[in-house]
Each structure stands twice: as structure tokens, then as C-alpha cells.
Amino acid sequence: MLSPKRVKFRKQQRGRMRGVATRGNTIAFGEFALQAQECGWITSRQIEASRRAMTRYVKRGGKIWIRIFPDKPVTMRPAETRMGSGKGNPEFWVAVIKPGRILFEMGGAEITEDIAKEAMRLAQYKLPIKTKFIGLDDQEKVAGSDKPASVPAITAES
């Protein structure tokens, strides 16, 4: 499973997930991708489960790129512990995901759109957030960018 080799600080605060992904929101390596539609945390176990599901379906047909990395430690306290006595120990690692972020990419000579779509569908079931399948031709930079760019102002005239 994925985790950082070494970190400057062992423990982090939880933080907030606001806005959309401004980086990592376009297809860079393959022809097909899985794009996040909402924000959330994806653990290293979920990333690994998705990767396995896709790899087993495409067998040796193509190449899969993982575009996210779990770099945030999540701490937990032991069960039935009294309040106080500091923050718990790091238990697992998560990747913070914002809408529009590309999670996985797939490409290769033997990968058709149908094969890629089915492999990504199997990976979607392993993830805790809504995602959508996109190709190079129909990619969008932002998850909600299918709305019109400028909405005319509605004024109330009496």
C-alpha cells in the first residue's frame, strides 16, 4: 500500500475540503481517466483495492497510472480511552480529493473505450466518492464546468 517514506511532522490537523481541484484535473498520461465529482478522503487501502480491480480486468493489456498519493496521516485513539492525554497515533494514510481531480488514468494499444469503462466501473465501487469516466476528447477541467460560463442576472421589474 502507498505511504510516504518519511515526513517532516508525524501528525496533521484534519483541515477542510473547499473548492475544486486546480491541479491534477486534466488527463496527462493515458487516454481514459476516472475523475472525482465530490470531495473526500481516499485511504491507501481503497487506492490499492481500486488498482487491483482495474489490473485484474485489463490483465496485461494496457498501463494504469495512479494520479493520487496518500500523504495525510489520520490519527486514532485506542477504544475506551479517557479524554485528554494528547493526540492519538497515526493509523493510516489518506489522499485529500477535491472535485475535478483525476484519480486514475489508463491507456495502451489494446485498451478500447469499452474495456477502460468497465475497468473504471469496477474501481468506482471501491471508492467512497462519486466519480465519472472521461476520455481525452471529452475531458473537463472542473467537475461542474458543464454549466454555462456566464448566467444573465435576473432582475425583478414591477
Curated annotation (Swiss-Prot):
InterPro entries: Ribosomal_uL16, Ribosomal_uL16_bact-type, Ribosomal_uL16_CS, Ribosomal_uL16_dom, Ribosomal_uL16_sf. GO terms for biological process: translation. It holds the Pfam family Ribosomal_L16. Keywords: Ribonucleoprotein, Ribosomal protein, RNA-binding, rRNA-binding, tRNA-binding. GO terms for cellular component: ribonucleoprotein complex; ribosome. One of its GO terms (molecular function) is rRNA binding. NCBIfam families: rplP_bact (TIGR01164). Belongs to the universal ribosomal protein uL16 family. Part of the 50S ribosomal subunit. Binds 23S rRNA and is also seen to make contacts with the A and possibly P site tRNAs. This is Large ribosomal subunit protein uL16.
